[in-house]
């Protein structure tokens, strides 16, 4: 996929982050030795295919300028463990659509990919966005 992705990361140095990192880097690779392990940080992809031209030359300034839903906390409920054949979705924790996660992803999609088209971003969120956290 061309472009950048925006990720939501669990708070660093928390039991959740530490447990997810251990699952990704140690526990699951030791149980599925026939599958090549990939080391990555725990994250939920909010949107992908953000053109580099939008955030060049200062990605942090672009991120700081995003108009995002006002919320101090995003909650994510695990609704299923979902195996798949796709490389980036070999084993995921499927997340629910509540707790502000979809609203955040919708705002990121509208501003990062759809040139501010909020209606298009809402349609994308309803029809295409599947919040998940990859484990393998």
Question: Whereabouts are the PLM-identified features?
Answer:
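Basic, often amphipathic N-terminal segments
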Residues: 1-77, 98-136
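Glycine-rich beta-strand-turn "strand-cap" elements at beta-sheet edges
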Residues: 77-87
């Amino acid at each position: 996929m061309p472009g950048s992705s925006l990720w939501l990361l669990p708070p660093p140095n928390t039991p959740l982050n530490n447990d997810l990192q251990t699952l990704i880097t140690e526990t699951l690779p030791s149980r599925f030795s026939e599958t090549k392990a990939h080391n990555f940080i725990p994250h939920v992809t909010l949107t992908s295919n953000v053109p580099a031209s939008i955030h060049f030359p200062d990605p942090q300034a672009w991120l700081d300028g995003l108009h995002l839903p006002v919320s101090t906390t995003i909650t994510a409920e695990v609704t299923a463990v979902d195996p798949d054949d796709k490389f980036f979705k070999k084993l995921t924790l499927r997340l629910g659509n509540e707790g502000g996660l979809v609203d955040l992803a919708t705002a990121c999609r509208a501003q990062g990919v759809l040139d501010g088209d909020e209606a298009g971003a809402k349609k994308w969120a309803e029809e295409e966005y599947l919040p998940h956290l990859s484990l393998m």
